């Protein structure tokens, strides 16, 4: 039996036998593969002949596969005919007839396909009709160290090709129709780096025996690696280069349960971005679910940007529109006509003064003279309505208000700043308020600290302090500090006499520092009567706003 010298007895393909269907030769002749399809056939058939000698040994499962030599793609058809006879004599499949079928491992392929013998003819006939994936091997076969290598399919999982019994829209998982580059090993046998994608391909362990081939002819959009196939064992998976396989046959059919498995078990993070084209039919099957999650921006993220852009566009459009003035009324027409005369007669240059003069003259006019300007104003409105039919006075009013607010905002800020500065830089002798003023401010803002209880002694120091106007703009803190400073600085007999009336343990804390209103209410009963005694003194003095001393 002819054999190939394929690198020291190493195998190139699967170590199992194949059953050749009658329609394979016809399909191969009809396929547009030209010479590369024949090269694939020669490669696999020669490997089948070569592996028949080493079929009894299990040690070849650990043998490292090397790239196929170039000559294997150019062998004559004699080896093909011999391989066909070899396949027809066999009882079961030894492997896929084409190297273009990548092997994908499915860990839980059911139990009744695992006996150590060939399938019955009835089961084989059933396999020709449907893809028997879902009844597949238990994980016990995966744990066996003596189980065949990934290149050995002997009596484990049936590999069925049925090119004539399938719908063109039922592809499962395929790769682009490109041939292996010379010297590049198959993706499922090599631990090297994929020359097309640059992604390292780690070798999968030898104990993962059950796997099944998938057609490479239909779906190029599901890339590798397929880490979802062995989630239970947590073992590393091999990857299949998307440009590494070529097959003339269309895709194999897949039932609904397998499609749900593919759609649910793909892990998006294991798959690189696709760089491929769709099937020749252009319509992917619903079972093919792209593993890459499409990231579409949410409407919440887009709406603020769109709203801001729309606002900017609207503002720009408003700015581009010319400012349409409202039609002049009778008085405005009179002012427009008489302003030049008034300016020539008067030496005043202020616009306000000129407007006042024009207003007086307008009211001094008779009804007949004013009626002339009213008629002019009516004509002006008619002409304006013809020129600008969609114009409304509200447009100008809104714009003017916005402009005024924008212009006034910095001025108001400067005004408030200067006002605060003036309040803070008052001299200490002038910033002291009258006792009534401090008491009134305390009533206005009871929660703020004030020197209302300390004011009975301090304000009575001088007569000029009582004549100060009521100041409501000064801060309570500044007022309290001024009261305490004035009390310490004053040495008049009236202040000493007032302080003498108060008890010594109570008067000193009250007069030494400002006390908030809440603290005076929550103070002990010994302090509260003294505060009540001080209040009549506050109320007895008159409330003077602009009074001056009579001296």
Curated annotation (Swiss-Prot):
Primary site of residence: nucleus
DNA-binding region: 324-392
GO MF annotations, alphabetized: DNA-binding transcription factor activity, RNA polymerase II-specific; RNA polymerase II cis-regulatory region sequence-specific DNA binding
Position of the signal peptide: none
GO biological process, one term: regulation of transcription by RNA polymerase II
Low complexity biased stretches: 445-464
Biased composition regions of type Polar residues, renumbered to the chain: 465-474
Biased composition (Gly residues): 1-11
Residue ranges that the Swiss-Prot or TrEMBL entry lists as coiled coil: none
Keywords (A to Z) from UniProt: Activator, Developmental protein, DNA-binding, Nucleus, Phosphoprotein, Repressor, Transcription, Transcription regulation, Wnt signaling pathway
Disordered as annotated region, ranges: 1-77, 183-213, 391-474, 492-515
Superkingdom, natural source: Eukaryota
InterPro entries according to UniProt: Catenin-bd_sf, CTNNB1-bd_N, HMG_box_dom, HMG_box_dom_sf, TCF/LEF
Region of interest: Interaction with AES and TLE4-A: 109-312
Matches recorded under SUPFAM superfamilies: HMG-box
Compartment(s): Nucleus
Sequence segments annotated as region (Interaction with CTBP-B): 408-551
Post-translational modification: Phosphorylated. Phosphorylation by csnk1e promotes binding to ctnnb1-A while phosphorylation by gsk3b may reverse this effect.
Region feature Interaction with CTNNB1-A, mapped onto this chain: 1-61
Function: Participates in the Wnt signaling pathway. Binds to DNA and acts as a repressor in the absence of ctnnb1-A and possibly ctnnb1-B, and as an activator in the presence of these proteins. Required early in development for the establishment of the dorsal body axis in response to maternal Wnt signaling.
Subunit and partners: Interacts with csnk1e, ctnnb1-A, ctbp-B, dact1-A and gsk3b. May interact with ase and tle4-A. Interacts with tle1-B.
Family per record: Belongs to the TCF/LEF family.
Annotated protein name in UniProt: Transcription factor 7-like 1-B
